[in-house]
Swiss-Prot record:
Record-linked SUPFAM superfamilies: DNA-binding pseudobarrel domain
Subcellular location: Nucleus
Keyword vocabulary terms for this entry: DNA-binding, Nucleus, Repeat, Transcription, Transcription regulation
Domain of life assignment: Eukaryota
Source organism: Arabidopsis thaliana (Mouse-ear cress)
Composition bias type Basic and acidic residues, residue spans: 410-421, 432-442
Gene Ontology MF term list: DNA binding
SMART domains reported in the protein's UniProt record: B3
DNA-binding region per UniProt: 11-103, 169-265, 307-403
Protein name (Swiss-Prot/TrEMBL): Putative B3 domain-containing protein REM4
Length: 512
């Protein structure tokens, strides 16, 4: 018969659950039940706590298996099926859950107290150490014994956050799920200490080079958890921050629009990749340079979010409205309605108005028909480019009706939607010019040209079956096919916009 469990701050038993490969809710290990519950759990309810949330989570038990309430807890904490979780027994049926895995949306902070007792600290564990945890066969060892194997991790975590005990500092763990969902959860203590636990507003993330990204501060309606969304992925990408990194922010401005400043700290760089990420940030200072992706041989131009190529959609002339992609507007600081100026290559200006769609992070340009027509964009499917000359309030956009002209006049490379057609057209023109020049040279030298050798009578007899008639028919067939393709693309684009709008409405309801 096992001794009864006596909770103490220095020796608390816990068990570890590896969620990878499990298709059902987790189960409390049998060995833990025998050692600490005399072989049988009498209660049908348990309480879960975590450092990521201030509330207690009620979870029902079906024998030893987690039942009702576990799904709400896992969704709120962004738990995935490849995570490794520690359940510390705090007495009775209360368990404190800590992440050893990859998907918790907040990092666990070291306590602001300077106590020498390591057991009072909330430790940060690295993703690359998860495999070592999973190989531990003893599921009911003391937390002290387990954490003694992580001394180096504790020291590293203490270094990362020893200066973050100030209430104005926020430490965040960049996880794959946070990048995938494009949001970052805000630690409840930080939000409450700085008056952000009940607010919904815009919030700026500022990097070391004073460049800002505007995100939206929102709250989960079920749990009250604060999070920032819409721009987190872009911020990490532009600053060379990868999944598994630790970022530290300082609240440098509160008020209507708070500002979080990224602290210059090596903790924002994954271990082993610090030099590579540092090079990326240095390269990003040079406009037009390219960042080489770590896991891909392709290069991504830094100015890719300044210029976009569009095809004119049927709804534009019908509604006199043109929708700007949400990511394009957000990444260029277009976050509020107001006046917008559109320029063409000749410097002619058109004043228009940006309207925000209520409840969404999307804008449309009202009264855009005039500058489209004036710049030769008149038919459905006509390509044109928009370049952001100045973002933020009262933005200035430059329109060009031809992709080729935009690339040559501004010095920016623009993606061509029909590379084969645009590449072959100049070649065909050159070949035609060469043939014309050769014929002209032969005629000037006195030699017989093809037209002088031909009999006009024979040409008139063959006219009904001339090549020009076939060319016209082929050309018309190509035009008809191209029109059908463009119409189909337009319909797909409308459906895509509807689906994006639906996703944004779901996000607005707090279903993250």
């Amino acid at each position: 018969m096992a001794d009864p469990l006596i909770p103490s701050p220095t020796n608390k038993a816990f068990f570890i659950i590896d969620l990878s490969g499990q298709k059902s809710n987790p189960i409390i290990p049998t060995e833990f039940i025998w050692n600490h519950f005399n072989g049988k759990i009498q209660s049908t309810n348990m309480k879960l706590t975590s450092d990521a949330s201030d509330r207690n989570w009620d979870v029902k038990l079906d024998g030893a298996r987690f039942a009702g309430g576990w799904k709400d807890f896992s969704v709120s904490h962004s738990v995935r099926d490849d995570d490794l979780l520690s359940f510390r027994h705090d007495g009775g049926m209360v368990f404190h859950v800590s992440p050893f895995g990859r998907s918790f949306s907040q990092i666990q902070l070291i306590s602001s107290s300077t106590s020498d007792d390591d057991d009072d600290e909330r430790t940060v564990f690295d993703d690359d150490e998860d495999d070592d945890v999973g190989d531990d066969d003893d599921n009911s060892i003391s937390e002290d014994d387990f954490c003694s194997k992580k001394i180096s991790s504790k020291k590293r975590a203490r270094k990362e956050t020893e200066s973050s005990s100030d209430k104005s500092y926020l430490v965040a763990h960049v996880t794959p799920s946070s990048l995938l969902r494009d949001n970052m959860c805000v630690l409840s203590k930080f939000a409450r200490s700085n008056g952000l636990d009940r607010r919904e507003c815009e919030i700026d993330l500022r990097d070391e080079h004073e460049k800002s990204w505007t995100l939206l501060l929102r709250h989960n309606k079920k749990t009250g958890q604060a999070f920032m969304r819409g721009g987190w992925r872009s911020f990490c990408r532009n600053n060379g921050i990868k999944a598994g990194s630790i970022c530290r922010f300082k609240l440098v401005q509160s008020g209507i629009k708070p500002v979080l400043q990224l602290c210059p700290n090596a903790s924002s760089i994954p271990e082993g990749n610090s030099s590579k990420a540092r090079k990326k940030r240095n390269v990003s200072e040079i406009e037009g340079d390219e960042i080489e992706s770590e896991n891909c041989s392709e290069t991504i131009p830094l100015n890719q979010n300044k210029i976009l190529t569009f095809d004119l959609k049927p709804y534009v002339f019908r509604s006199c409205q043109f929708f700007l992609p949400a990511s394009f507007a957000r990444e260029n600081g277009i976050v509020e309605a107001g006046e917008v100026t559109v320029l063409n290559k000749d410097g002619i200006e058109w004043k228009s108005h940006l309207v925000n769609i209520k409840g969404r992070d999307q804008f449309y340009n009202r009264g855009c028909q005039d500058f489209f027509v004036a710049n030769g964009v008149k038919n459905v499917g006509d390509p044109f480019t928009l370049e952001v000359i100045r973002g933020g309030p009262s933005p200035i956009l430059k329109i060009c009706s031809k992709v080729k002209q935009a690339a040559s006049s501004d010095g920016h490379k623009t993606a061509d939607r029909k590379p084969r057609m645009t590449d072959q057209a100049p070649l065909a023109e050159e070949q035609t010019d060469n043939r014309v020049e050769k014929r002209a040279q032969v005629t000037e030298e006195g030699g017989p040209s093809r037209s002088t050798r031909a009999d006009p009578g024979n040409l008139q007899q063959k006219q009904p079956c001339s090549i020009s008639d076939h060319v016209k028919k082929v050309k018309q067939s190509i035009v008809d096919t191209l029109t059908d393709v463009r119409r189909f693309q337009s319909e797909l684009k409308v459906k895509e916009q509807n689906l994006e709008a639906s996703l944004q409405e779901i996000d607005a309801l707090g279903m993250i």
